[in-house]
Design a protein with these regions (language model features):
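Charged DNA-binding/catalytic regions of mobile-element recombinases
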Residues: 1-254
Length: 254
């Protein structure tokens, strides 16, 4: 009976949508024949709610695990740029695919108004090359720049906008970590004169991030590595970007 109770608790906690009948069937698959009332008694004894209440309180970890392959996240960062009339603030938007850590530079503007965000939404959901196309969920904070029209555009493409609670950066940790990386490794180390110089730096960093930078969250692997020699025989070379701000060491082919 102890094994049955352990299994009932496990099935219910790992599968928030499973009701008594579904749990009963899973137990039968393992050779345990029990009545639905037994499952109900066990759940109550262990303080576990019935399926409807359990499903409504699905843990964040369970949600991420269930939809990991189809979740993306988006966020803005700001960068100060010098122009003809002094310093201006540019808003830079990025999107990230959680499973692969691939990042997309979605655009930048000094005025992220509704028209601009709607155009970005069209680009992100484009059925040919939209970064969010075929994603099911998109995590975002409650920034007013993610307008109702923008969220409706995502929803119309089959992507559910998941608006996170205020002051909860840990729930969007993947894109927050990317923002810290691009700031500390690139943007905070440079002074920008005009939008074009910032755009070039962002594109160079994103290329470095994908093809040259190791990622601890991926077992210290590179997301999209370039071909490397199979034997450690060639000379070690350094590829520099942005005048040496970014460096990648590799071997020449022997």
């Amino acid at each position: 009976m102890k094994e049955i109770e352990r299994l009932v608790v496990r099935f219910a906690t790992e599968n928030p949508s499973w009701g008594y009948r579904r749990i009963e069937g899973a137990l039968a698959n393992l050779g345990h024949g029990v009545a639905r009332t037994t499952g109900a008694i066990i759940l109550k004894r262990n303080g576990i709610d019935p399926a409807p209440e359990r499903r409504s309180r699905m843990s964040w970890r369970t949600f991420l695990g269930a939809h990991w392959a189809t979740i993306a996240a988006i966020d803005f960062t700001t960068v100060e740029v010098w122009g003809r009339h002094g310093r201006i603030t540019l808003y830079v938007l990025f999107a990230i695919e959680l499973r692969s850590r691939r990042v997309h530079f979605a655009g930048m503007t000094p005025n992220p108004d509704d028209a601009w965000t709607r155009q970005v939404g069209r680009n992100l959901t484009d059925p040919i090359d939209g970064f969010l196309f075929e994603k099911r969920f998109c995590l975002m904070d409650r920034d007013a720049k993610f307008t109702t029209a923008f969220r409706r555009m995502l929803a119309g493409a089959g992507i559910e906008p998941v608006r996170l609670p205020p002051r909860s950066p840990n729930l969007n940790a993947w894109i927050e970590k990317f923002m810290r990386s691009i700031k500390s490794e690139c943007l905070d180390r440079m002074i920008f004169f005009g939008e074009d110089s910032l755009r070039r730096a962002v594109r160079e960093y994103v290329a470095h991030y994908h093809a040259e930078r190791n990622h601890q969250g991926l077992g210290n692997a590179i997301i999209a590595p370039l071909p490397v020699p199979t034997k450690a025989l060639g000379r070690v070379r350094c590829r520099e970007r942005l005048g040496g701000v970014l460096r990648y060491y590799h071997r020449e082919a022997a």
